[in-house]
Amino acid sequence: RTDFQVRRGAWVALGDTSPALRMALLLSEDRRFHEHSGVDWWAVSAAAWGNLWHERTRGASTLTMQLAGLLDPALQRPASTARGLSQKLAQASAARELETRWRKDQILEAYLNLVPFRGEIVGIDALSHTLFGKSAHALNAPESALAAALIRAPNAPASRVAERACRLLQQMQDLKVDCLS
């Protein structure tokens, strides 16, 4: 069993995380994070349309909605099933409430510190020290892309995580982000 001190590291202020990590996270999980107020209605519409036509869709949960689930166990998805409509609506309502009380930087900081990564690793401090042997502010672009790739499917096969990380890194390079060093 993993040492519980390693499992959840220290709280890391958002300013103490690398710009590459913040960019990789937003590209991976919520591209319109700074444009919505907790619920990305465009993503909800796209997911609903895809579900209607039985197409594979990307989830519509924003970072704020995911954070609401991390903060309130009643809003977390059951391990064996998908979220029901009522649970999804409750999560959206909680996300909107969070957005009225917290600033975007506070939401992003809390998310990075509470999100589960691979196995029992929770939070960016535990991940950066366990996986990379360094602090969160020292993560470079490839490491940041890998960290963000682990969020979507923390226990996916390594090949799938690596493929996703490579796609994220390419997106970061395509945007010519100045945090790639």
Language-model region placement:
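Juxtamembrane regions of bacterial inner-membrane/periplasmic proteins
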Residues: 1-181
